[in-house]
């Protein structure tokens, strides 16, 4: 058990140090950061905690999920206009595979890094996916 703690503690310190640094240096226009800042002010707290991470991650992920749906709809429309139904179907297949990957990868992150990752990891992956899908359309 001691050996596990000796390996786990440095990993957690590195994770939370990087997480804290990323939070303080990131773009303030980021939805997640805005949520965290607003919640800290609203609750009159000085530091972020796991509940705030979970709440803001879930809230931000919901926004990205809507954006993904919007972009997928745009891809569907473009595919119809260009008579390329396979294009849309292939992207839907990759979307399902991507979702399975995110679910498993973020479950691993939560298990091995810590519980905040169960919500923070999917939010990050959804943001990346929005950017990735936008490359496929003329927005």
What residues fall within each predicted segment?
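Bacterial N-terminal signal peptides that target proteins for export
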Residues: 1-9
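Intrinsically disordered, low-complexity segments enriched in polar/charged small residues
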Residues: 11-12, 134
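N-terminal signal peptide c-region/cleavage motif recognized by signal peptidases
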Residues: 15-19
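N-terminal alpha-helical modules
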Residues: 21-139
